[in-house]
């Protein structure tokens, strides 16, 4: 690793406001926001160093573990699962699923232009296909059919500034009966009155949209740069029709 990172530990910053300075071995200093993923992915190892190690992001591990555990509880092994990974980034979630025995195909999608390049650089061969763009622009039906997909996953992809409820439901309904859903989302999604996405999740929990929610747990997603915890929920569900 030919860089070090200085985190801005100012209190009270929103997730999208957190900043850092990357100091390279040649003396260059690069200032960026944490959510400038394109700039993060351009530096090999930077995302893992900051998000996974320094800020202790647990979403990929929690999502993968919860999904595989629920599959086992329902008498299914993970090996044949074939996954559409939404907001796939440089492949951290896909790698965690692979480590837990998912041997089927992974298809990634991300709206960050540099994500696919970073995923192939950091985790070569993990994805059989990697699509650039918004989920709403993707023909999910054709992708599901082409790769015979049986799972939809997304770590942190749901919430304000990310995928809308209607867009997500349009994608989820293209999956076959018995398909698995695994997502993590900020706790505010479930706790805010009048939130479209929160109302959608509530409908899923009530058995709506041909979905059975079988796990919904709160967990510490990661630390803020100032040290306070950020909490998310992990949801595991199945398609019933």
PLM regions with names:
Residues 1-33:
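N-terminal auxiliary segments of SAM/dcSAM-dependent transferases
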Residues 57-79:
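Conserved alpha-helix/loop element of class I SAM-dependent methyltransferases that forms part
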Residues 178-186:
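Conserved beta-strand signature within the Rossmann-like core of class I S-adenosyl-L-methionine
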Residues 149-164:
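A short SAM/SAH-binding and catalytic strip from SAM-dependent methyltransferases
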Residues 207-241:
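Class I S-adenosyl-L-methionine
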Residues 140-152:
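A short acidic, Gly/Pro-enriched loop at the edge of an enzyme's catalytic core
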Residues 84, 90-140:
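Class I SAM-dependent methyltransferase SAM/SAH-binding core
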Residues 166-177:
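A short glycine-rich, Lys/Arg-flanked "PGG" loop and its adjoining helix->strand segment in the class I
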